[in-house]
A protein has these predicted regions:
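Generic detector of bulky aromatic hydrophobic side chains
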Residues: 45, 178-179, 208, 216, ...
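Iron-sulfur cluster-binding cysteine motifs and their immediate structural context
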Residues: 183-184, 189-216, 220-238
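Proline-rich low-complexity regions
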Residues: 45, 52, 119, 181, ...
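A mid-sequence, solvent-exposed acidic-amphipathic segment
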Residues: 156-191, 195-196
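FMN-binding flavodoxin-like domain, especially the glycine-rich phosphate-binding loop
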Residues: 1-26, 30-173, 233-261
């Protein structure tokens, strides 16, 4: 998604582009520095209505240096709540000038039903069109964009931002922060793929049944395991997932795009 935006923007502007995937821990060991000649598409997933809090300190360490910025969030077909306004504020507070923003539905980390298959071809085309429009705005209005600056207006509550509260039947709140995937020993071949994919570096590569650190429920180990050896069996988690799928599984959400001018 972000790659498509950056490539389309660069093509429209006739400039180079580079990408930085900070999903894995080793990619977050040092933060990039940007400057006034840069335009940065900054994408993050929505976690319980917010920017992922465990990776937030890294995002805050990225300095814009006057670069133009485009905050983009994905969300799993429920809502992005305060994630987009929070990301915009992080960028503004760290030297970016936000000129556009977007929120796109994407397959939920818990499920293949919630926004399954998203982003799809239509989403990717919209992302490209979004980037080209930003290029057009910058080209046609360089002084208004680069001069006096007003942050792009987006939905959401101002800081302090709100977390979404997971619930089950009878609207009972649950806490699934300590829930971790289980490993089926009859299916697991100890290939180590799950450990290599874990964004927190929490899975023991020698024994993938051991999760030493925090699990953020990104679903990578579950969805990418070639043997289907990983799953979450916690009853509250499964009930919450079922309710989400019941309420939002057949809903088709549209991307939302925002511009300063």
């Amino acid at each position: 998604m972000i790659r498509s935006m950056a490539r389309s923007f660069a093509s429209a502007m006739g400039c180079d582009f580079a990408e930085m995937d900070v999903t894995l821990p080793e990619k977050r060991e040092s933060a990039p520095l940007f400057g006034v000649d840069d335009v940065v598409f900054f994408g993050v997933p929505t976690y319980i209505g917010r920017v992922p809090n465990l990776i937030r300190p890294f995002f805050v360490s990225i300095k814009g240096g006057g670069a133009l910025g485009i905050p983009v969030v994905t969300y799993g077909n429920r809502a992005y709540d305060d994630a987009l306004v929070e990301l915009r504020d992080i960028m503004e507070e760290n030297g970016f000038k936000t000129v556009a923003a977007a929120a796109f539905p994407a397959e939920h980390s818990f499920s293949t039903t919630l926004a399954g298959g998203r982003p799809n071809e239509k989403d990717l085309q919209l992302a490209k069109d979004f980037a080209r429009k930003i290029a057009e705005i910058i080209t046609n209005n360089p002084h208004s964009i680069c001069g006096d600056h007003t942050p792009v207006a987006v939905p959401g509550n101002p800081a302090p931002y709100s977390y979404y509260k997971a619930v089950i039947s009878d609207n009972k709140s649950i806490d699934i922060r300590k829930v971790k995937p289980m490993t089926d020993p009859e299916k697991c071949t100890k290939c180590g793929l799950c450990a290599l994919l874990c964004p927190m570096g929490s899975i023991n590569i020698s024994d993938p049944s051991i999760t030493n650190g925090i699990c953020i429920k990104c679903g990578a180990c579950i969805k990418k395991c070639p043997r289907g050896a990983k799953s979450i069996t916690d009853p509250d988690y499964l009930e919450h997932k079922r309710l989400l799928e019941e309420e939002y599984g057949n809903v088709i959400k549209k991307a939302e795009l925002f511009y300063t001018t």
